[in-house]
């Protein structure tokens, strides 16, 4: 083939590629693999904005054929790098998103926001975008047009003015206000609701990855822990996911032999994401450390245990205690941590009769762990320099918790400690859910409020008897009804 023919052939290939919408889409997807801005469309627009933990959202309406949009994209991505994804510098504050109005499927969505030019940027609380719209003549709207964001610097300055921050494009990971924020900030705990979901999903994934349910003992331990989550997890989606695992457990793990691989059906544990398909997200917020290998998962697990402890009733206290002890002993993969925790469990000689006793035991155990790790990390230099282990709670958060203290010991007022823990890991922990629910529809507000609802009498039940815990958890009525229906429908298949 001559050089002329080769050039003609290459030209035809290029022409065909440029004229094919499918080819353009493929090329755009390849080039966007590392994009930080979240691509939204008419299908996922509401769900993504409704579920984001971020307090604010930026939505860019653009057209992929628009030269100005292509030139603006690097500027937008510089800002998105600060806020989006697992490597975000300031995660959980602003969600940066994009909608391609050149795609026919997005036409109605773009029309709802009266998009008059490209690119056009909007700002507001994420929930205000959900099933929302924008009209240029409307005087009062919580959705604002960003009128000064033509460069990355100007866009970030505009955002800084809105939220009273001083973020910079040169901010580096873990060298930021978010990581340096004082743990004594009472309002920080509201972000931990997402970290509890993250830690729950990560713990479940670790069990799947290690195929850790290997005996009747580990199977029983797993079931009891999932029962505890189904009744008392602070996240409704985690409670729902745990309930679905319970209902299907006999089929997923016949005789304790579980199938772990993820497939297209619902016949393996891997196909039941315990906190929903969007969790884990890949990053932590309240539990974010100043180094990649600090805090995170272990911090999230502690918040989970504290949040469970304040949600149980007196009759469940010892069941919750033995369930958590067995779970750590069977499924926590840090061997030294597991052994130390098990020793503290074995030191309890008398069964707990009051929920208060269990709340204080979790708190005391956490402080003992922190004391030990503080010494180890100081000698080895492995601690988090920005978040050193401390005795909890500090005086700044609960001065009444301290009767007296010196460098060697602290005399605690256990009644005030208990009241502090009940509030801090109870109503305070779900405050963000309550705040976000204000702007939602009635149905969504009810769902958000359910995150405050816990069981009042969840008891130990045999393996496979998910119905029993549903009946026992009287305050968890919706879940009980769901379980009863599922178990009733399953009976004919067991004949």
UniProtKB/Swiss-Prot annotation:
Q: Which reaction equation describes what this protein catalyses?
A: 2 R'C(R)SH + O2 = R'C(R)S-S(R)CR' + H2O2
Disulfide partners: 66-69, 287-299, 334-337, 398-401
Q: Any keyword Secreted?
A: yes
Give the Gene Ontology MF terms in alphabetical order: flavin-dependent sulfhydryl oxidase activity
Q: Which UniProt keywords apply?
A: Disulfide bond, FAD, Flavoprotein, Glycoprotein, Oxidoreductase, Redox-active center, Secreted, Signal
Q: Which PROSITE patterns match?
A: ERV_ALR, THIOREDOXIN_1, THIOREDOXIN_2
**EC number in record:** 1.8.3.2
Annotated function: Catalyzes the oxidation of sulfhydryl groups in peptide and protein thiols to disulfides with the reduction of oxygen to hydrogen peroxide. May contribute to disulfide bond formation in a variety of secreted proteins.
Name of this chain's protein: Sulfhydryl oxidase 2
UniProt gene name: QSOX2
